[in-house]
Swiss-Prot record:
UniProt entry keywords in alphabetical sequence: Cell adhesion impairing toxin, Disulfide bond, Hemostasis impairing toxin, Platelet aggregation inhibiting toxin, Secreted, Signal, Toxin
Location of this chain's protein in the cell: Secreted
Pfam families on file: Disintegrin
Protein name: Disintegrin DS-AS
Organism: Atheris squamigera
Amino acid sequence: MIQVLLVIICLAVFPYQGSCIILESGNVNDYEIVYPKKLIVLPTGAMNSPHPCCDPVTCKPKKGEHCISGPCCRNCKFINSGTICKRARGDDMNDYCTGTTPDCPRNPYKD
C-alpha cells in the first residue's frame, strides 16, 4: 500500500518519465525515491496517513478500530448487521452489511 502511494507520488513528480525506483530505508518516514541520476528524499512525516483509521506503518486499521474504508465501514467501525449497503434496482434485491466486514456482500438469495 505504501509503495503504491509512493509510485503515485513518483508519477506526480515525474509525470513524463518512464519510471522511478522506490527504496525503503527502515523507517516508514524515510523513504527515498531514486530516479536515474537523481535522488529525492521525502520530508519527514511524508508517509503519515491522512486517514484517521489507518496505521501508516502497517497499512491496517489502527489498534481498536475495525476497518479503514468500505461500504460497510463508518468511523473506523463495521456498520451494524442488516444495514442496507446497496439498494435494489429493478428486480434485484437489497444487499446488507454483515457487521463483520467492511465489504458489501451480495445477497445470497439473488438469482
